[in-house]
Amino acid sequence: MSLSTLKRDHIKKNLRDTEYDVVIVGGGITGAGIALDASNRGMKVALVEMQDFAQGTSSRSTKLVHGGLRYLKQLQVGVVAETGKERAIVYENGPHVTTPEWMLLPMHKGGTFGKFSTSIGLAMYDRLAGVKKSERKKMLSKQETLNKEPLVKRDGLKGGGYYVEYRTDDARLTIEVMKKAAENGAEILNYTKSEHFTYDSNKKVNGIEVLDMIDGETYAIKAKKVINASGPWVDEVRSGDYARNNKQLRLTKGVHVVIDQSKFPLGQAVYFDTEKDGRMIFAIPREGKAYVGTTDTFYDNEKATPLTTQEDRDYLINAINYMFPTVNVKDEDIESTWAGIRPLILEKGKDPSEISRKDEVWEGESGLLTIAGGKLTGYRHMALEIVDLLAKRLKQEYGLKFESCATKNLKISGGDVGGSKNFEHFVEQKVDAAKGFGIDEDVARRLASKYGSNVDQLFNIAQTAPYHDSKLPLEIYVELVYSIQQEMVYKPTDFLVRRSGKLYFNIQDVLDYKNAVIDVMADMLNYSETQKEAYTEEVEVAIDEARTGNDQPATKA
């Protein structure tokens, strides 16, 4: 199956008429990883997501697939070792969505990291995380540190560490994993909310009843097993089951701000400690912008729409001006923001940054499997753990046998580029090929870098589609049409926020082209006038929330 919005009705019919080995509730990176692993082993898989894919936590991270240097500080050695190895796998299987990025770690007198401890720590990190030779840490003098990033605070500067992180587009990583699962036969649908579990005569879960969030229809999906992978909604989903354990989530909120490089001319990614509380945060250049985050505060409010408060903005502005004192960033320099929720497992008495990011699998008497906690980087290994258990139960209860996990070397959608070492060459080949389609070289390079081995489909759209009638630039038009045909974009915000990332990193494009995008989608997807008005309002709300945030309390009134 493809993830085509134009096939929604067909997918829905299949979901109604088929009994699956497993139905997964949740369409973030965790659910996507499980769908890929299970379908790759030959299981019959369904997945539903009540919003858009990655709309919860998986589009709101720091957008790093990282080895977890901060966990070394907390002596979580096992976490560093596992995430480091997983990071390399994620990169190799999808170099079009993950890119190595050298990170500068400035060391100041009285700061979190001293020269000796940093050198030892980074050496341990390299060893534990299995870092390749070309990417192993370097220790820098004060002058070398300033050469890397002249904006860094000079007062008390002793030197710096230099090590590699991996930058990603979290929402695109999620959709590429999801597309590969669909390619393997998984039946996947967004805007489909799990409302209730269904049970057999032995009180074992045997499916879910769902609500189509677009047309209001309800129907049942039958499955031998159900996996709850709903991130921040894990507790709500399993509250409908009679057999839940006493574990629960503790949500924390993380906020990022985006500033144009004309206001904050950051040339080098920097990982630094704040003056206020010593928390480590990132400042990362991307596409002519610099984004900075994250905060870490307890959160008990609306899960679907966590917002950036003035307190969050002030915290990050103060952090920027402390570490980069000559830039003098002001609140009005912030172009866009995003806020995300971390679904952590409750550990009483701990501060937000102290709570472990580990994942756990919970199995209820009803047979419901729930996966909680975890991180973006570990999605593949998390899937391996729960699908191993799923396979074991399907064998015990139904006599079904499936292959072992084989995702370690499985390319995600768009990842067939000849390996990470060949990726730059692959992109240049595609740039040459694009000349035959009359596509500008810079546009072709951006598309090939972003879509990997799927880029030929976008080139074909460029050749055949009537984009001149759309009032859209060719690049935006082909991405939009492709996202409808292959990435299950149904609402304008799906495209403007998650598939393209424009709301965060090019909000001017959203302001300039939002109406043209809505017109193309209304035409392709036959929106009613009511839908068009509602979705237009959603775009306006998203713009407002990204630009100004809100005075949203951490706890519901």
From Swiss-Prot:
Names of the cofactor(s): FAD
Binding residue positions for FAD: 21-49
Gene3D superfamilies: Alpha-glycerophosphate oxidase, cap domain, D-Amino Acid Oxidase, subunit A, domain 2, FAD/NAD(P)-binding domain
InterPro entries linked to this entry: DAO_C (IPR031656), DAO_C_sf (IPR038299), FAD-dep_OxRdtase (IPR006076), FAD/NAD-bd_sf (IPR036188), G3P_DH_FAD-dep (IPR000447)
EC code: 1.1.5.3
Record carries keyword Flavoprotein: yes
Pathway(s): Polyol metabolism; glycerol degradation via glycerol kinase pathway; glycerone phosphate from sn-glycerol 3-phosphate (aerobic route): step 1/1
Main enzyme class: oxidoreductase
Gene Ontology molecular function: any one: glycerol-3-phosphate dehydrogenase (quinone) activity
GO terms under biological process: glycerol catabolic process; glycerol-3-phosphate catabolic process
Pfam families tied to this protein: DAO, DAO_C
GO cellular component: cytoplasm
Reactions mediated catalytically: a quinone + sn-glycerol 3-phosphate = dihydroxyacetone phosphate + a quinol
Protein name as annotated: Aerobic glycerol-3-phosphate dehydrogenase
Organism of derivation: Staphylococcus epidermidis (strain ATCC 35984 / DSM 28319 / BCRC 17069 / CCUG 31568 / BM 3577 / RP62A)
Protein encoded by which gene: glpD
